[in-house]
Amino acid sequence: MKQIIILFGLIFLVGCNSNEKNPVIPKKLDAYFENSSNVNLDKEIRLKYIDSAKNIIQEASENDSIKIKNYFKLANRYFILLEYDKYKETTTKILDISESINDSLNIAKAEYYLGD
């Protein structure tokens, strides 16, 4: 019985190893996106929240679908605030990442966003 418990304990400890060096904090990112959508705040304050979210997204180490999804959220916030230069810059970044990982769905979506 002791051997089984020790075996499960070892499997549990080995299975809990995380390879992420800089994990993105989703709650903080969601809070920034939520505050950037608050119409009761001034445009400058909302832009600061968006820029903070952008910094967190850029720190994510891997170019994956979650990073692209967050960049699309970022682009939408810039579009709502009529920051078209930052919108275009963010959408171009999405397109570059999508092309680098051969993600045809997000390439098409980024091209559509650039057409707006």
Language-model features, listed with the residues they occupy:
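A "functional boundary" signal
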Residues: 16-116
